Amino acid sequence: MANAGLQLLGFILASLGWIGSIVSTALPQWKIYSYAGDNIVTAQAIYEGLWMSCVSQSTGQIQCKVFDSLLNLNSTLQATRALMVIGILLGLIAIFVSTIGMKCMRCLEDDEVQKMWMAVIGGIIFLISGLATLVATAWYGNRIVQEFYDPLTPINARYEFGQALFTGWAAASLCLLGGVLLSCSCPRKTTSYPTPRPYPKPTPSSGKDYV
């Protein structure tokens, strides 16, 4: 029997990670302008996401420009977009599958083993979703580091990690942890031994033997 509390905890953590992946994908602060160096501009903040780039003025006014051309984007941004969207879609599938396998739900009550396997499959899908998010954020973050330390990159064109990137890392961690907890509900095989057959007891003879 699977631990219902462990299942519920894993489902909640993985679901929170899935929500975090959506928030991270939508936020425009994947990388923010770096103020390191001599060229320091404090009147505005420049940041860029997967779908747009924005400039925030000190007065509170924000101007954003959506990336219109798909072919004009670099390969890292395109791959990050694809992985994040795939991770979100997989997380949605995992939520439906895991819900069926939860012990607190009444689906598949007649088949306890199949119900537990549904929870395990949902946990595995959550693991794949978390890996997709982790690879996407790590790849994008590595690109930021490479460009920051590249001597050919101008000082006024260097960026640092943004809030959305940290949100994505936290979301991936929650999805992975929740997926592991759900996968721990895998039904264990029990060794069955053959039941010994009872031998009939000899019945005592009712009469006496005569020679």
UniProtKB/Swiss-Prot annotation:
Detected in epidermis and liver (at protein level). Widely expressed, with highest levels in liver and kidney. Disulfide bonds join 54-64. PROSITE patterns: CLAUDIN. GO terms for cellular component: apical plasma membrane; basolateral plasma membrane; bicellular tight junction; cell junction; cell-cell junction; lateral plasma membrane; membrane; plasma membrane. Residues 190-211 are annotated as: Disordered. Belongs to the claudin family. This is Claudin-1. It comes from Mus musculus.
